[in-house]
């Protein structure tokens, strides 16, 4: 008799040309939802996939008497769970009349990235997504002793060993699954707090940075579901003398990457300073608990920048200063930030 694992891993390619498409969307509180459908294929162009719908009253995105929300396929990735020709589909959300619903942040971001002035600058983003793995039964990072606290931070950052690195199997599974899916995941590392990790997505151009980060988050949620662990994107999951969790956003334009780009970078940083309050308001919930001026953060109340300064709002790398061109890092976004909002806002502020 076939086991459950055997059935889950069934290869359908020899018996049917049908494939499974997992449609993914963002709900009312910034969580991820998904459901699957059977299609004939294969398909590698999202415009050739059918639109679909879901019950918005069950996701906080529509009233019960008019609950249908339409999901538009926007980006396709290979499915690392079902494998074969099966796909993950990142979608955004609309009314039946074709208007983006309020929680659809991708639509406005796509408009900004399609602006001729923005498109001409070919904006690159690299996002450092920090997250914390928590025990399912209690709100405590994995690696915490039952009824107690781990030793102070210091040995956990890029640490190895059973007393320093907790959850590496999840991290490596996620790393490989993202590569399989076609996400440009560029690395992983253990972070400063026990049970805290980081993966990096990018460089990615324009709207694709948001698509790739959201699907990477989805894959992480699915893997932790299998492992029986909870993934938290809270910017300060554990109060006290512990680092928070951010989503540092590295950014460059064509002009910044060319000769003389450092001067363009400094002008862009000056523009960010003039809109510090607006950016902070859009950079994630609970960020005031993280941006305290301690634990490698700048104060939420004051904009600052510097070369190699991880206590600044914006950091410029030594290599960029030395070469006179390159990129900068906006260190303000929280781990739970909306990547469509953050990336498009940075581009809009610095280019338009």
UniProtKB/Swiss-Prot annotation:
Tell me which EC number(s) this protein carries. 6.3.1.2
Start and end residues of each GS catalytic domain:
105-352
GO BP = glutamine biosynthetic process
Iron is among the record's keywords = no
Q: Which reaction does it catalyse?
A: L-glutamate + NH4(+) + ATP = L-glutamine + ADP + phosphate + H(+)
Which positions fall inside the GS beta-grasp domain?
19-98
* InterPro entries in UniProt: Gln_synt_N, Gln_synt_N_sf, Gln_synth/guanido_kin_cat_dom, Gln_synth_cat_dom, Gln_synth_gly_rich_site, Gln_synth_N_conserv_site, Glutamine_Synthetase
The family database entries (Gene3D superfamilies) matched by this protein are listed as: Glutamine synthetase, N-terminal domain (3.10.20.70), Glutamine synthetase/guanido kinase, catalytic domain (3.30.590.10)
Query: What are the recorded GO MF terms, alphabetically?
Result: ATP binding; glutamine synthetase activity
The protein's UniProt keywords, in alphabetical order, are: ATP-binding, Cytoplasm, Ligase, Nucleotide-binding
Which top EC class applies here?
Answer: ligase
Q: Which GO terms describe its cellular component?
A: cytoplasm
Compartments annotated for it: namely: Cytoplasm
Cited PROSITE patterns: GLNA_1, GLNA_ATP, GS_BETA_GRASP, GS_CATALYTIC
Q: How does it assemble?
A: Homooctamer.
Family assignment? Belongs to the glutamine synthetase family.
The identity of this protein, by name, is Glutamine synthetase cytosolic isozyme
